[in-house]
From Swiss-Prot:
Name the record gives this protein: Golgi to ER traffic protein 2
Record topological domains on the Cytoplasmic side: 1-167, 230-276
Upper taxonomic lineage: Eukaryota, Fungi, Dikarya, Ascomycota, Saccharomycotina
UniProt biased composition (Polar residues): 22-48, 56-65
Annotated TM spans: 168-187, 210-229, 277-297
Gene Ontology cellular component list: endoplasmic reticulum membrane; GET complex; Golgi membrane
InterPro entries in the record: GET2 (IPR014802), Get2/sif1 (IPR028143)
PANTHER family: GOLGI TO ER TRAFFIC PROTEIN 2 (PTHR28263:SF1)
Sorted UniProt keywords: Endoplasmic reticulum, ER-Golgi transport, Golgi apparatus, Membrane, Transmembrane, Transmembrane helix, Transport
Family according to the record: Belongs to the GET2 family.
Length: 316
């Protein structure tokens, strides 16, 4: 009666069959069959199982040195290293090994402090301090980089500043138009003798003097507006560059040195301020031209009766 094999015995038999199958080059042929390699392939077609095993030689030289002698020699080496002057700690040695640049700067710093490498143990006065020069260069580089960076302002502060500027501009325009409207009315009046009570008023309402008086008023009001605008910029820490809008956002993407103009962002911001002031002058000119047309139509539609003076006695 045949006895049933256990699972361990079955695995053992399968392992032995596989080893017999892979012996004598069977592993290499199975590997080539799986990978599809041919015999003339450049890749290695020999299986690891078919490679000859290298048996390590058992003729190792036994060490005759006892543990006590090893400890003694190690202690002597440590004493010798500790007796060397200027020997660094293990932490400094590890730092020097991991970062040789740090070790070089530490050595140079020690030479600067001790005056080593100079005659008579003192540094030469004509030789610049290496670390002072490095620190000064680093400080100057950081300062210049900080100046080149745009000064960012809080969005709420910028919105409040723009609101104040719009309010100031509206007040200036309303005051100017309140003065220009009656002035144009009297200039376009068909009866010039209405305001001839004094010589000054007659000169003001003279049409030939209109452009000079209008330009003088514009210069005064634009100067007031520009000075108050600068005061708002100082109070809110806002510059012309920050208030320029989206144009400078595209210019900041251009690297420094590509454009031939230096500080082009500041120049464009200042040009936009001047353009704003010039646009106010052009707006007032357009307003005056409209007033001329309205007043001419008004006086022609509603003529004013001019009183006829009685004839002087004795004159026929």
């Amino acid at each position: 009666m045949a006895t049933e094999l256990s699972d361990a015995e079955k695995r053992k038999l399968l392992r032995e069959r596989r080893q017999q199958k892979f012996s004598n080059g069977g592993a290499s042929s199975r590997l080539n069959k799986i990978t599809g390699q041919q015999q003339n392939s450049f890749l290695s077609s020999t299986s690891v199982l078919d490679e000859p095993k290298v048996t390590p030689s058992g003729n190792k030289k036994s060490s005759n040195v006892s543990d006590e002698e090893v400890e003694k020699s190690t202690k002597e080496i440590q004493d010798l290293l500790s007796s060397i002057p200027g020997n660094k700690d293990n932490s400094e040695t590890d730092a020097a090994e991991t970062n040789p640049e740090v070790a070089l700067f530490q050595q140079l710093l020690k030479m600067q402090q001790q005056g080593g490498g100079f005659q008579n143990g003192s540094p030469d006065a004509s030789t610049p301090d290496l670390f002072s020069s490095l620190l000064n260069n680093d400080t100057n580089t950081t300062a210049s980089a900080t100046q080149m960076l745009p000064n960012f302002v809080d969005e709420k502060v910028l919105k409040y500043y723009k609101f104040k500027v719009s309010k100031l501009k509206s007040y200036i325009i309303l005051i100017k138009w309140a003065l220009l409207a009656p002035y144009v009315y009297f200039i376009m009046h068909p009866n010039p003798t209405v305001l001839q009570a004094s010589n000054l008023l007659s000169q003001i309402v003279e049409r030939s003097n209109f452009f000079s008086i209008f330009t003088g008023l514009e210069i005064v009001f634009i100067s007031i507006y520009y000075q108050m605008l600068k005061k708002l910029q100082r109070d809110n820490n806002v510059t012309a560059t920050q208030n320029a809008g989206g144009i400078l956002k595209y210019l900041t993407m251009i690297p420094e040195g590509i454009l031939p103009i230096r500080n082009i962002q500041g120049k464009i911001g200042l040009a936009l301020e001047y353009f704003d002031v010039a646009s106010m002058y052009v707006t007032d000119i357009c307003f005056v031209l409209v007033l001329f047309g309205v007043m001419k139509y008004y006086h022609s539609s509603f003529p004013i009766s001019v009183p006829i003076e009685p004839p002087i006695a004795g004159i026929q």
